[in-house]
Amino acid sequence: MESGHLLWALLFMQSLWPQLTDGATRVYYLGIRDVQWNYAPKGRNVITNQPLDSDIVASSFLKSDKNRIGGTYKKTIYKEYKDDSYTDEVAQPAWLGFLGPVLQAEVGDVILIHLKNFATRPYTIHPHGVFYEKDSEGSLYPDGSSGPLKADDSVPPGGSHIYNWTIPEGHAPTDADPACLTWIYHSHVDAPRDIATGLIGPLITCKRGALDGNSPPQRQDVDHDFFLLFSVVDENLSWHLNENIATYCSDPASVDKEDETFQESNRMHAINGFVFGNLPELNMCAQKRVAWHLFGMGNEIDVHTAFFHGQMLTTRGHHTDVANIFPATFVTAEMVPWEPGTWLISCQVNSHFRDGMQALYKVKSCSMAPPVDLLTGKVRQYFIEAHEIQWDYGPMGHDGSTGKNLREPGSISDKFFQKSSSRIGGTYWKVRYEAFQDETFQEKMHLEEDRHLGILGPVIRAEVGDTIQVVFYNRASQPFSMQPHGVFYEKDYEGTVYNDGSSYPGLVAKPFEKVTYRWTVPPHAGPTAQDPACLTWMYFSAADPIRDTNSGLVGPLLVCRAGALGADGKQKGVDKEFFLLFTVLDENKSWYSNANQAAAMLDFRLLSEDIEGFQDSNRMHAINGFLFSNLPRLDMCKGDTVAWHLLGLGTETDVHGVMFQGNTVQLQGMRKGAAMLFPHTFVMAIMQPDNLGTFEIYCQAGSHREAGMRAIYNVSQCPGHQATPRQRYQAARIYYIMAEEVEWDYCPDRSWEREWHNQSEKDSYGYIFLSNKDGLLGSRYKKAVFREYTDGTFRIPRPRTGPEEHLGILGPLIKGEVGDILTVVFKNNASRPYSVHAHGVLESTTVWPLAAEPGEVVTYQWNIPERSGPGPNDSACVSWIYYSAVDPIKDMYSGLVGPLAICQKGILEPHGGRSDMDREFALLFLIFDENKSWYLEENVATHGSQDPGSINLQDETFLESNKMHAINGKLYANLRGLTMYQGERVAWYMLAMGQDVDLHTIHFHAESFLYRNGENYRADVVDLFPGTFEVVEMVASNPGTWLMHCHVTDHVHAGMETLFTVFSRTEHLSPLTVITKETEKAVPPRDIEEGNVKMLGMQIPIKNVEMLASVLVAISVTLLLVVLALGGVVWYQHRQRKLRRNRRSILDDSFKLLSFKQ
């Protein structure tokens, strides 16, 4: 049997007995209790060492007032007890905060949770990462179950329930995973509100032997274990909001719960429920192994970059000093701290940093010998000055992509470049890091290849073993510093200011002062074996990180393996290097805001009338400080190896999907069309361009692209360059696709939503999206969709059979292999021009986009070169997307979008299915913004009130009502067709597009999956962002109907959830029945393909049947031998007991005889 078939066969055998365990039974007694929780028990901002009264920002959250709650709230949390009397509480570490106790288990173990609810409303406990049946899911939603299977869904006040969870091999950490995986548990009656109320805790599942036999168990592979929740805890969603207002506001009647400033004061930017450094100290020893279990929860604003100052983390084999955390994202990071001291942990998202998401951790020497100095490399000296300049965001004066004047009236660019008595225009005072030749700071360094750096400082480069020495001269008017990522430094050289208890509260240069920084690159700071040869990092000023970086002080830093840099300091094996910073530079938060307003001679009377519009005009959506393709053109040759070093910075809206039009890139050996950036994250993407022409680099988030976050790169055929071998293609597959206009219903059946919420219509979360009352449009909209036809006559639609039913609004799943030519014959049967444009493929047209007018037929040819298919670390197939690109934003929101999968050669079978999978599902998670559809006015006329003119299209409620939080165009479990059999191999193509709010963390209940990045990693949540396309694979193991949903709070309530069903193996014998509230549909089993036979629920090639039978026979014989051996042991024990009884009987008789004789 081939290794791939053997692997899947063994995985399937494992799924046959998911609950067979050979480990311990770990029993926990958890009580749900109401408590009073203080987010800042020390009563001050610990980071700045300021009392609340003198800290304006901290006091806005923590000081109570007549209409402010302050820093103390009633919450409901999980507590652990020693037994079922629930009287003797188990003490928890103080730093765990309001989190529930840490639940721990190994593979093969059973976890029994005795849950008792001492609170005043129903709650549950629902886990991630473990196996459970319906009676232990702890999640309330309509799933067709009843009776005892629903008892776990809602434990009433005073009630109790026992939850039974197991950790079978199908949920175990993989070989590539760390010894223990990070998960969570939480209440799931109304999950967003339950969690906001406080019901959440950590859970780890470990490999066998990772835990010792103590109670509670301790890990044997690490010395310290820490669990941190990063979350903007929204107390406005707490079940106790009204009670908290009544208790803590001195004038409760004056409170307006809809007031935005009141709501903001209740959003606590917390780590484990503590803000502004109030988290009790996290202590550890230098040179000891530390495991950090990091997780997030919350809403769209919960984009977190946790920065560990002074140390290095390892996650999934890669070195980093930051961790990206999103709602229901779990990160397991390992650290061996080297530098003693008190260090900062902070979320580097600007607004979160400002609002208190910071804590301290302390590394003690613990009498350890100081580490051996392993710095055997060079001392690399840099002379860098902070220099104030006037910066022009659009020096060309026109859009480099379209040629239009930036100040063209009515254009989007005019909003940013208009110069008037109420607008500054495109030129601002800023400050920039600049490189000089020596310590005299007389002669600047000018390199032609650095022209594209723009506002960025010079590139600092070093290899492992090197020392970086930076002489920093602050020639600006504010104190500034230099704080690096990715290198080591002692406390004396740290560039961030905070209260660490030392005499060095941050090395900062005052105006016209020089300071020297010393950073080192020991071996444990360099790239790992899984990392590329060079790692991309960043340095920035952190005297005031938010104002300093918005003023312009940021630059790139490159750390490479020893020998990776040439004599000229450039990376070997790379022809071109480009460093690009994607950020919305907020000039309102610059040190020079007042100076810029004064220089523009603004009329402050006009400003006061439109302060919001003025502030928005100062938020510059820039790449290296340039908008609308004004970045100097990035030139390269066809076949070059190009390294793109990408940097992120900013606030929670700075979620950037960096798209490379015309060519693809590799990230860590995985093929991508986009690289995701968040504040203080860094990515290196490798491109080998094979597509000649001029293309855009842009942020995929639609509003960012519209606002000018675009640049141009050019690929030329250069003389003297060795021609790359020409890829050979062969005609392979033809698709006939029509754009047709339909009436689309996002939620044709509201029964699931109504049963789930069990509320009146107006009180339902879905009312605003689904009602057609009060001037709202309801759930039905005119849209345009891609649909497949049988041939070029476009007369017979290709029917969507069972496997395609789930596609919903999406066009057909187009598939190809490397080396194929895909031909798409497109007929536009809609009422306006549309096109078909695909990511990832090599489009043969020289005109982009090639549009079809209404009634016109256009043929597209897509070649599939090697760089379109899976990279060395990818799965067998990678997912892409296609859509109409005449107006990419309006066309897509109108409905014209579909999935595309490109596979390795030989993976696809003649009928188009994958030979290595039994099922394939393509899911698009997108907030369809009907306000940006071409058909908005028609929809208002058709579905609005009788007088369409009475509807205010800019009304906030109306705008929100038209944002449909959909999975394949359906809300509230209306998507059908996600059905599979137990033991089947399932590939999920997970797609996301849209805006910065399209942050989606998708959780599969009851199942885990494998995510491939060179190695396989276990997860049950996949993170999606605009322009990201992921492939995850699972073996369906748990029969039942289960929930799949986005874990972002607002998205849950808005209906971004659906059901998938796993049918048991016995149901293979009968038609597969999908029960809905509308009708019952029978979906016949898939046909058995020629040359295959069906065994164990799988289609097995005939040539492998004998081998699989042999494996099954061997397993059967092994089990038989085990049974015989156990039987022998039992017989032997029984015989020994019988002999002992006989001996005792003989002895008794002997004693009696002796007694008688005496």
Curated annotation (Swiss-Prot):
Changing residue 269 to A: Decreased affinity for Fe(2+) and decreased ferroxidase activity. Loss of affinity for Fe(2+) and loss of ferroxidase activity. Ca(2+) binds at residues 134, 152-153. Residues 1-23 form the signal peptide. The keyword Transmembrane applies. InterPro entries: Ceruloplasmin-like_CuRO_5, Cu-oxidase-like_N, Cu-oxidase_C, Cu-oxidase_fam, Cu_oxidase_CS, Cu_oxidase_Cu_BS, Cupredoxin. Cu(2+) 2 binds at residues 128, 186, 1047. Residues 24-206, 218-366, 370-560, 570-718, 731-903, 911-1067 form the Plastocyanin-like domain. Cu(2+) 4 binds at residues 304, 347, 352. The keyword Plastid does not apply. Its main location: membrane. Na(+) 1 binds at residues 70, 73, 265. Changing residue 960 to A: Loss of affinity for Fe(2+) and loss of ferroxidase activity. Cu(2+) 5 binds at residues 656, 699, 704, 709. Binds 6 Cu cations per monomer. GO terms for molecular function: copper ion binding; ferroxidase activity. It is a single-pass type I membrane protein. The chain crosses the membrane at residues 1111-1131. PANTHER family: HEPHAESTIN (PTHR11709:SF221), MULTI-COPPER OXIDASE (PTHR11709). Belongs to the multicopper oxidase family. Part of a complex composed of SLC40A1/ferroportin, TF/transferrin and HEPH/hephaestin that transfers iron from cells to transferrin. Plasma membrane ferroxidase that mediates the extracellular conversion of ferrous/Fe(2+) iron into its ferric/Fe(3+) form. Couples ferroportin which specifically exports ferrous/Fe(2+) iron from cells to transferrin that only binds and shuttles extracellular ferric/Fe(3+) iron throughout the body. By helping iron transfer from cells to blood mainly contributes to dietary iron absorption by the intestinal epithelium and more generally regulates iron levels in the body. This is Hephaestin. The lineage of its organism: Eukaryota, Metazoa, Chordata, Craniata, Vertebrata.
